[in-house]
Regions:
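Active-site loop/helix belt of alpha/beta enzymes
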Residues: 1-111
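C-terminal accessory subdomain/extension
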Residues: 109-219
Length: 219
């Protein structure tokens, strides 16, 4: 990838220095592992094998989450699953294990033509029941989803209306059968990879941008 580490020339040009080090693990990282048909994966794996022949007794690793799914020939001595632990790889068959519950702070009725949020970017087309929730772009709900994203009550989408604020977001709950105590960022049919696509980014960025105010509970 030409980011860090040694290329082929640097490796063989410094073998004496390298062999004097207490080596424990030889690492590389696949540049195109998220594209299973990309021939660069094979090319990079073969180069890795060639370079590792210089250190036959040292453990080797080239695969992170996506690389692990490319097959056993990419596993070597160790794999490094990261986002895969959270099921954040589309069409992988992995169980989706992330859920973010967002508490409702207030619900109220707005009339037709009333406006919502900074710069009044949303105007109600009819009388609506809305809810304001305790999450915003400081927590990882990006502003790009203003007036186009959604949160969920069970599997029912609740459209985001108005601009997403630093700490707050407002959604339309007119169609819900009850007033919810909280909504969720994801649903069984709308997971991290779908959320990332709507944000025009990747799942990794979505997850690392989740703020410290979001409590983590592992079960």
């Amino acid at each position: 990838m030409n980011r860090l580490g040694l290329n082929k020339q640097a490796l063989f040009g410094n073998l004496d220095k390298i062999n004097s080090l207490p080596l424990n693990l030889i690492l590389s990282h696949l540049a195109c592992a998220d594209d299973i048909l990309n021939r660069e994966n094979i090319t990079q794996k073969n180069l890795f094998i060639e370079l590792c022949k210089t250190f036959p007794k040292i453990r080797k690793s080239i695969a992170a989450s996506h690389g692990t799914l490319l097959g056993n020939e990419f596993h070597f001595d160790m794999v490094r699953p990261g986002i895969g632990l959270y099921g954040g790889i589309k069409n992988s068959g992995l169980e989706k294990v992330i859920q973010i519950k967002v508490p409702v702070l207030q619900n109220f009725i707005i009339d037709k033509n009333m406006q919502v949020g900074y710069n009044f970017t949303y105007k109600a087309k009819h009388k609506m029941k809305v809810a304001t929730l305790s999450i915003g772009y400081a927590d990882g709900l990006p502003r790009i989803l203003s007036n186009r994203g959604k949160l969920f009550y069970e599997n029912i989408p609740c459209p985001i209306i108005g601009r997403i604020s630093m700490d707050l977001v407002t959604v339309d709950i007119s169609h819900l059968p009850t007033i919810p105590e909280d909504l969720c960022m994801f649903s069984p049919e709308y997971q991290v990879d779908d959320f990332a696509k709507d944000c025009k980014t990747i799942s990794h960025e979505v997850l690392v941008n989740l703020g410290e105010r979001i409590s983590r509970v592992y079960s």
